[in-house]
A protein has these predicted regions:
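Short glycine-enriched, charge-decorated loop/helix-capping segments at active-site entrances
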Residues: 23-29
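Conserved beta-strand scaffold positions in the cores of enzyme catalytic domains, especially
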Residues: 27, 75, 132-134
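N-terminal nucleotide-binding beta1-loop-alpha1 segment
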Residues: 1-21
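Conserved N-terminal catalytic core of the sugar/cofactor nucleotidyltransferase
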Residues: 1-7, 33-123, 127, 150
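Short beta-strand/turn micro-motifs composed of small residues
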Residues: 12, 55, 107, 136-137
């Protein structure tokens, strides 16, 4: 998968206010590992040329965990809370200017995303020669989630954050 080049950006800057917890959302445990630990295990299995992790809320706690568990991760501090787009923008500014490949952006709080799904996503993106590719799911009850709104042609019309 690394023939063209791939970097991964993990979004871990959010505060997780809906969880009503003093613990950052990505640091909650699932099956003996933090949510971000599950995500990082998957991200580092993709043979990227770098995994960039965007931090803001309680960044010291998350940074300490990453430094111990994933020392090769490149930590990027988000300067202002301005949504997912700003988090991606900040991370892109840290990727070397001469990088000529694809950027895979994943959420740090989606622990069940597996290597094969992401490998297939990157392959579909590359075979379709797309500018951008978004992995989506159809949910019976999408309340509580951001949404991808599609046009009548099935293409993305807009993204609505929760």
């Amino acid at each position: 998968m690394s023939a063209k080049g791939l970097v991964c950006v993990v979004l871990a800057a959010g505060s997780g206010t809906r969880m009503v917890s003093a613990t950052p959302k990505v640091m909650h445990q699932l099956a003996g590992r933090t949510l971000i630990g599950h995500v990082m295990a998957t991200a580092t299995s993709l043979k990227t040329s770098g995994v960039y992790v965007v931090l803001r809320h309680q960044k010291e706690l998350i940074s300490e965990y990453l430094t111990k568990s994933y020392p090769a991760a490149i930590q990027v501090e988000q300067d202002e809370i301005a949504g997912t787009g700003r988090a991606v923008e900040v991370s892109l500014s840290k990727i070397p200017a001469d990088f000529a490949g694809d950027v895979l952006v994943i959420s740090g709080d989606v622990p069940l995303m597996d290597t094969q799904t992401l490998t297939d996503l990157v392959a579909a993106h590359r075979s379709g020669k797309a500018s951008a590719t978004i992995l989506t799911a159809l949910l019976e009850d999408p309340s509580g989630y951001g949404r991808i709104i599609r046009g009548s042609d099935g293409q993305v019309a807009k993204i609505v954050e929760h």
